Amino acid sequence: MAKRTLGLAKAAKAKKQKREEKSESPEKDSGNEEEQLTVELPEGATDEISQLIGLHQTYLQSERDNELLVNGIIHECDRLLRSNEDGKEELPAIFHSIYATALAELSKFVEEEEEEEKKEKEEQESDKKIKEFFDAALERIEIGLEKHPNDVNLLIAKSKILIDQIVLQYISPLSVDSKKKEIEVEVEKLLDTALEIYELAEVKANESKNYEVFNDLETLDILQALDDLLDIVDNFGKNNLEEEEEDEDEETEKDNGDDEDEVEIELTEDHPLYVIKTSDKYNQWWRDHTHTYLDNLKKLDSKDVLPEVLREVNHRLGQSYLQESEIPTTVFTTLKYDDEYDGAKELEGLTVEEAQKISQDLISKALKYLKGAKDEEDPETWVDIAEAMITLGNLHDIDSKEQEDLYKEAEEILKKANNATNGKFKDILENLLEN
């Protein structure tokens, strides 16, 4: 399975969310939370746990950049714990899941100084805070699992927390010169653990026929978190290189801008990320379990499946097959049409016939899932289908019936999308008609 292309998710800085406005002190913010935090809860949220779930859902459906709201969730969990000190009523698994998730989420709000000469003491303090948040989150998960063994929601939450911990606590402080002996864990083994826990959640959901747990964007976040992590590893070190080049003369930057993505950062065998970067098993795991996710959604009554979840899973699968098709597609077009390769039998270990068949198969699969991701209210999803059809058409013989049929259908889709968006896709349509 092909590695993902640069730019699917932007390194660890995309995971560490910055506060847009700095408060003078965290203590002051905490003291004012009750009067500042106003959240509209869903209808029917009468009991305290339902209200907590509503608060949690409000955060999930937001931009997830509101530290005040996360602290509000944690304070509500603390209050529920205090009111239940006698243990007369056992708190449900979802309580522990929400509590742990919120504690882990706080790690994303730890300030990271922009100054180059950041004091070592400040770095250590920042790292310490992140570690404390994750330790507390994982401790809460274990408390929940003691009371609710193998609960699917708790297992899913634990898997997601571990993946976030890998990124923020273990990968974020690394440089290209880091060595395995410098950190306390083997990153790939911790990642294996996170994925094994998710697999256990799949098994337990299947045993209990609890497929509804997958009908949720929060659960789907795990696959996105893994995709982000793999993207960070694939492109590790490139961001620093780009930042250095930004300091160069603007004209030089423009001249060299097209070459940035071509730079390959080599990691030594004793680098903490070497195993993940050089293995394709994690990419394949992502693909396999995204398929499983879709299969689990299909086990629900179709009318109960959230359309946005179904479309998102299909979209991700479609895009992954398109990305995998890029190399064989390039090989085919190069060997078939590039005069510089006239007479060449192979490129990247593929003949023109092999590259053509592999590309056609992959893009046909991509089309299947992109059609499943189509949203009648979103012309962008129509254009995704049309562009895949054009790419597939390019892989057939010129003026063949297969090519003409694909181009014709793509043209109809683009015209419809263009009309719906006042000409937003005019360039794509004109390019198709010209060729």
Curated annotation (Swiss-Prot):
The keyword Cell wall biogenesis/degradation does not apply. Its main location: nucleus. Residues 242-263 have a biased composition (Acidic residues). It is found in: Nucleus. This is Enhancer of translation termination 1. Belongs to the ETT1 family. GO terms for biological process: positive regulation of SREBP signaling pathway; regulation of translation. The gene is ETT1. It comes from Candida tropicalis (strain ATCC MYA-3404 / T1). Keywords: Nucleus, Transcription, Transcription regulation, Translation regulation. Pfam families: Nro1. It comes from the Eukaryota. Residues 1-44, 239-263 are annotated as: Disordered. Residues 18-31 have a biased composition (Basic and acidic residues). PANTHER family: ENHANCER OF TRANSLATION TERMINATION 1. GO terms for cellular component: nucleus. Required for correct translation termination and probably involved in regulation of hypoxic gene expression.
